[in-house]
Amino acid sequence: MDNREQLRRITELTEQIAGLPKGYLSKKTIGGKVYYYHQWSENGVKQSRYLHDSEIAPLADKIEKRKELQAQLRMLKSQKSRRNEATGMKCTFMHKRTPVAELELDDVTGFIQKIGSVYAPEHLPIGIPVRNEIADRAAFNDWWRDRSIPASRSGVREALESLGVADTKMLLVRCYGLSLSDQYWICPEGAELRWEDINFFQNDFSEDIGDVLFGERKKKDALNFSSPDSTSDGNLKKRWKIIDGKRCLIKGGSNPFRQQPFNEVIASGIMERLGIPHVSYTVIWSKDAPYSVCEDFVTENTELIPAWRLLQAKKQKNSTSRYRHLLECCELLGIGNITPFLDRMLVLDYIIANEDRHFNNFGALRNAETLEWLGMAPIYDSGSSLGYDKMPGQMRSEKDVVCKPFKNHHAEQLKLVTDFDWIDFDRLSDVDELISGVLFCEEAADYIDEGRIHAITESVQRRIGHLQELAMTQTPRQLDTTEDDVREEVAADYAPKMEL
């Protein structure tokens, strides 16, 4: 097989594999009945979905087919050939204006094949070790993969087919890896590109990718891939737009209630009342569906480092809790005031019953050129809360409420709070009006009825009351224990779930 045929076959196999489900089937017995579910990992995050009986056999066949194709692809890649010369793209990994390392990317998969000279190891993403002047390729690929759109996002597979791209990592390559969250990018060999001319903070960007991700018909002309939508994470439908000169993120909600956009506004109102630094949200409507809108809080001089990357600053001991490990990592990196920030975040998440505060949903800000830490970022992304996927009865019982990032249950996370004195409970006296004002609107009635609104209001008021009792009776103390720690960093799965 010559190089051209080999490349054609590799591309074909890669596209076929991308269209098949990952992971494996598992089962568990509840009340004597066996339930099957699909389990897989996405960007290092474990995901799972319960299956109807009719789904089990077809899904098992597809997973087995994926394994067969992966074996063929591995065999093809292992053959001695000049494939790397045919498909490798050499580039310089940049941090704003600073050359950091030489890379070679696979033209088909977007993976990092080789890492050459490292010029500025201090500018590498946190958690990528350098040994004997060589950067760890596996760790670099993990970071690069996390930068791409997750394959689990709603509508992404259809979007890839429409774009003619086999893997979301190839979208990264086509936009030079540029983002509106940080200042990293890649400069292809021989390209005379300057950060000032191509970054999305100071230059306009195409809406083509966002249009396709939102299911809008692909235009007849050639697509412009220069878009920050290629480097946005998360499973919900989202896109970037320039509105009145500001970079704004537009994000949807999940069926059946489409509640997340409204929850962002409610959470913003609660944080405003409590004096918690936060990102402000509003709701807009498009094609009879609600979307939240927020302005980018990162600028051309700063960047967001998610807590997940902060945790990579040092190895976690088995006897150390996730909470304690984060504190130690922040101390090692020189990030101050982490404890007061976590106090406020955990209290907020208890009030709104947030279920998805994973380690990529909060982080720290730093100067991209000097690497000076500026403190923790304002709190953002609080939509998967307020019983967003639950019925009113479930909201009132709260028996199904789980949480992240440190403990599995909010009651245990509250034990990590060191100080309640900053909470002005009088400022929360009108929370019921806040919730009603956001949810009682004509458009929202198609998704959220009056009974649901009352259940949300009652649940929030009950949690505020319990928090007030706790603040008066409990002496806050940090618990350095791994009991009830979150073991898997599982992002919210918005796929329909089978009722148990």
Question: What annotation goes with each model-predicted range?
Answer:
Residues 1-81:
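A positively charged, amphipathic N-terminal helix/segment that binds anionic biomolecules
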Residues 74-347, 351-353, 364-500:
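Phosphate/dinucleotide-binding and metal-coordinating scaffold of catalytic cores
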Residues 358, 363:
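Canonical protein kinase catalytic loop motif
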